[in-house]
Amino acid sequence: RLRASKKLYQHMTLAVQQANRQFVTLTLREELLFGQNMTAEKRRKQEEALTFLGLKEKLEHSVFQLSEGQKKMVQLISLLSLDLDCLLLDEPFAGLDERACNYFVEWIKEKSAQQDFLIVMHRLEPLSGVSNYRIELLQQQLIIWQEGTTCK
């Protein structure tokens, strides 16, 4: 059973709410390269994200000196660059402004053809129209939504 779990975890990763707990290197550049098989396409996508989000000039800065929102952006850029079957995201947009949130929603949409996402959120509107299923806990009942239909 343990062997099956280890095998499963090789195909997925988790983004925790507190991005600080996930960083393993000092600089933003090192963090984005850590454990990655960097293709030209991944590098291009990371560069695009860094430029769009205003982080490109901070590549040599310590990730621990960034604001909480910037740390969350670095965490998402790093994890969305991975080629895994499944990403588990816990409050991925916490601390992000609307512009950054929309950027990552679009990136998730692009990647959803190749990857599965399990996303835990309190604010549902950013992912409206993105997910195939939505499970809500409402008044101690689970409500499952599937592409516009509801079943309890």
Can you say where each PLM-predicted feature lies in the sequence?
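H-loop (His-switch) and adjacent beta-strand-loop-beta switch element
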Residues: 130-148
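Conserved ABC ATPase signature
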Residues: 62-66, 70
